[in-house]
Amino acid sequence: MPKRILQGTVTSDANAQTVTVLVERRFTHPVLKKTIRKSKKYRAHDEKNAFKVGDTVRIIECAPKSKTKRWEVLEA
């Protein structure tokens, strides 16, 4: 099964080797026919602490790195 790749914005870089990434998805409501925005935060592994708040990054699924980290930063 291929690994998912998502794109989002870094919202926190306070922890060592970890960034919080806000990923937004858009879809059309089936009844209202209105575009709806939903967002979700993912904690991703950042080996070199290279990314700062506001950076747009791509994250990829990986084996669990910790209790909450299942993603790692692929590129900016």
Curated annotation (Swiss-Prot):
GO terms for cellular component: cytosolic small ribosomal subunit. It holds the Pfam family Ribosomal_S17. One of its GO terms (molecular function) is structural constituent of ribosome. It comes from the Bacteria. One of the primary rRNA binding proteins, it binds specifically to the 5'-end of 16S ribosomal RNA. Part of the 30S ribosomal subunit. This is Small ribosomal subunit protein uS17. It comes from Ruegeria pomeroyi (strain ATCC 700808 / DSM 15171 / DSS-3). The lineage of its organism: Bacteria, Pseudomonadati, Pseudomonadota, Alphaproteobacteria, Rhodobacterales.
